[in-house]
Amino acid sequence: MAVKIRLARGGAKKRPFYRVVVANATAPRDGDFLEKVGTYDPMLASDNSERVVLKKDRIEYWLGTGAKPTERVAKFIEQAGVTLPEKVKKEMEVKAKNRKARLSKKEAKEA
């Protein structure tokens, strides 16, 4: 079973609120999850300490079992001071390179 650490949207229309959850990769975005490991409120100021709240010990446990964070959640985890496994860091770098290559290719095609 592939497990991901990702965001699940909540809140009302135009007032998003996200839970950071550990879920099966094939489960729907807002569907069943294994564990809630934090919250993210994008409506708060970026310097507010309540904007991103994470359970560091549980995230470390899930990363140790092989759960893969999404790009946004990986940024939150790094900002919280949790070290990501080298494999995850390399995968993120490769994705970033591929994204840049696609964008430059698209821009060249449009020009």
Curated annotation (Swiss-Prot):
Gene3D superfamilies: 3.30.1320.10. Keywords: Ribonucleoprotein, Ribosomal protein. GO terms for cellular component: cytoplasm; small ribosomal subunit. GO terms for molecular function: structural constituent of ribosome. PROSITE patterns: RIBOSOMAL_S16. GO terms for biological process: translation. Disulfide bonds: none annotated. Transmembrane segments: none annotated. InterPro entries: Ribosomal_bS16, Ribosomal_bS16_CS, Ribosomal_bS16_dom_sf. HAMAP family: Ribosomal_bS16. PANTHER family: 30S RIBOSOMAL PROTEIN S16, SMALL RIBOSOMAL SUBUNIT PROTEIN BS16M. Belongs to the bacterial ribosomal protein bS16 family. This is Small ribosomal subunit protein bS16. The gene is rpsP.
